[in-house]
């Protein structure tokens, strides 16, 4: 069940990961989160900002950690919130924990301006 979330952020499940992420034509930022995760509430507005800023060059998906153990294991997510920037099956960037707006934008600029 693909649903649009705030400003172009798509909520996906393990079952949709291959289609929505691995087969995407553009880079994909995967945001792993949980409803019980306080720091995730700090990251969510930054994810929405990234969608607004880079939506023409970047696909952004969010995955709730608990119901999606396959992606969590495959991408070695050990803490939340976590971000994985992928192009196809290649992980370009990997972060865990809250990062600043400047760090997020810098990380994305580094990869998206080289397209």
Question: What kind of feature is each model-predicted range?
Answer:
Residues 74-78:
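A short glycine-leucine-enriched loop at secondary-structure breakpoints
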Residues 37-40, 83:
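The canonical Cys-X-X-Cys-His
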Residues 25-26, 33-36, 79:
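Short pre-active-site segment immediately N-terminal to redox-active cysteine/selenocysteine motifs
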Residues 9-27, 69:
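A short beta-strand-turn-helix
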Residues 79, 84-115:
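Non-catalytic, surface beta->alpha helical segment in thiol-disulfide oxidoreductase systems
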Residues 1-8, 49, 113-115:
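N-terminal targeting signals for export/organelle localization
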Residues 12, 32, 44-51, 55-69:
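Thiol-based oxidoreductase modules, predominantly thioredoxin-like and allied folds used
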């Amino acid at each position: 069940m693909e649903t649009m979330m705030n400003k172009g952020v798509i909520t996906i499940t393990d079952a949709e990961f291959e289609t929505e992420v691995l087969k995407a034509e553009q880079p994909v930022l995967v945001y792993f989160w949980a409803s019980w995760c306080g720091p995730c509430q700090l990251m969510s507005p930054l994810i929405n900002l990234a969608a607004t800023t880079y939506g023409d060059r970047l696909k952004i998906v969010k995955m709730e950690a608990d119901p999606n153990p396959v992606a969590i294991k495959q991408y070695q997510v050990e803490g939340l919130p976590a971000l994985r920037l992928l192009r196809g099956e290649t992980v370009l960037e990997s972060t865990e924990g809250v990062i600043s707006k400047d760090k997020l934008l810098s990380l994305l600029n580094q990869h998206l301006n080289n397209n």
